[in-house]
Amino acid sequence: MKKPRKDLFDEVKGIFTNYLKAQDYRKTQGRYDILYEIYSIDEHFEVETLYLTLKNKNYHISRATIYNTIDLLLDCGLIVKHSFGTKAGSYEKAYGSKQHDHLINIENKSV
């Protein structure tokens, strides 16, 4: 994973902050850490993969916090969810990303 562009991350952080204020939600470091890591990913991700990434980087963030933050980020349009025929949904960042299509290999279910 690489660092997100600072200008892009500042924009999405501002959007998220405004959303949290408007909804009267707390602005916690954990939520911003999750947002930062998501915007460091250049591909689709699943919640479990994100959790392991955060854990390996010594963040102390629970799965519940990740799931709750994912819901908030979906609501404010900063990420999108895809269902590619697997049990777990796949997510990707939405802001600052170019329109693209998804091709699914029906033999091995890869995207």
Kindly label every feature range from the protein language model.
Residues 75-111:
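Non-DNA-binding regulatory cores of transcription-related proteins
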Residues 25, 39-42, 56-57:
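Short helix-capping/hinge SLiMs at alpha-helix to coil transitions
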Residues 49-55, 66:
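A short acidic, leucine-rich amphipathic alpha-helix
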